[in-house]
Amino acid sequence: MKSKIDYTLYLVTDHQLMSTKTLEEAVEQAIAGGCTLVQLREKTASSRDFYQNAINVKTITDKYNVPLIINDRIDIALAVGADGVHVGQSDLPAAVVRKIIGNDKILGVSAGSVEKAIEAQKIGADYIGVGALFSTSTKTDAKAVSIETLMKIVREVSIPVVGIGGINAENAVQLKNTGIRGIAVVSAIISQKDIKSSAEKLLEIFVNKA
């Protein structure tokens, strides 16, 4: 059920940054470290490679009963039976995506303002990804979003909000009391030598309320 999705530690992949030989290894280690949700994001991969990667990664997420979200590529999400799709403001409109994937799939939408977040909720998004909260090398064109704006978005929408953008073990503590449901992380997990322990550390920092 979509209402029971755990967004706490949301892994976003990037095969160019991973420290392992395969995406499957990276994803499995991240899940072992506590990642609760996985998004396959491969902006430079060919359609064939993306499709194959999605099949391979889904074998891992299915094994551990962790939802798999596909970034942008609705066709691939449907082809492999992924749990949902995440789209940005420059991708296919979220309302159109919802019509294509139906109501049973998870729909995540990126938003950098209160207005965009409210709009995303109205068209049927299940969660909102807000960022970039910190400087990030994985999305150099991302506009910065302040912690203040993040908290305003949390107050204005009733669906889960996930923080994204440059989140790591040093700054994750700043997000603990913002009201967000989870943190989405790329390089601070997938590019680390010990992916499992890196995920465990981030989870401990974010979840620990001390």
UniProtKB/Swiss-Prot annotation:
Mg(2+) binds at D72, D91. GO terms for biological process: thiamine biosynthetic process; thiamine diphosphate biosynthetic process. Its EC number is 2.5.1.3. InterPro entries: Aldolase_TIM (IPR013785), ThiamineP_synth_sf (IPR036206), ThiamineP_synth_TenI (IPR022998), TMP_synthase (IPR034291). It comes from the Bacteria. Keywords: Magnesium, Metal-binding, Thiamine biosynthesis, Transferase. GO terms for cellular component: cytoplasm. It holds the Pfam family TMP-TENI. Binds 1 Mg(2+) ion per subunit. Disulfide bonds: none annotated. The keyword Transferase applies. One of its GO terms (molecular function) is thiamine-phosphate diphosphorylase activity. Its cofactor is Mg(2+). The keyword Metal-binding applies. Pathway: Cofactor biosynthesis; thiamine diphosphate biosynthesis; thiamine phosphate from 4-amino-2-methyl-5-diphosphomethylpyrimidine and 4-methyl-5-(2-phosphoethyl)-thiazole: step 1/1. 4-amino-2-methyl-5-(diphosphooxymethyl)pyrimidine binds at Q39, L40, R41, E42, K43, N71, S110, K139. It catalyses: 2-[(2R,5Z)-2-carboxy-4-methylthiazol-5(2H)-ylidene]ethyl phosphate + 4-amino-2-methyl-5-(diphosphooxymethyl)pyrimidine + 2 H(+) = thiamine phosphate + CO2 + diphosphate; 2-(2-carboxy-4-methylthiazol-5-yl)ethyl phosphate + 4-amino-2-methyl-5-(diphosphooxymethyl)pyrimidine + 2 H(+) = thiamine phosphate + CO2 + diphosphate; 4-methyl-5-(2-phosphooxyethyl)-thiazole + 4-amino-2-methyl-5-(diphosphooxymethyl)pyrimidine + H(+) = thiamine phosphate + diphosphate. 2-[(2R,5Z)-2-carboxy-4-methylthiazol-5(2H)-ylidene]ethyl phosphate binds at T136, S137, T138, G166, V186, S187. Belongs to the thiamine-phosphate synthase family. Condenses 4-methyl-5-(beta-hydroxyethyl)thiazole monophosphate (THZ-P) and 2-methyl-4-amino-5-hydroxymethyl pyrimidine pyrophosphate (HMP-PP) to form thiamine monophosphate (TMP). This is Thiamine-phosphate synthase. It comes from Ruminiclostridium cellulolyticum (strain ATCC 35319 / DSM 5812 / JCM 6584 / H10). The gene is thiE.
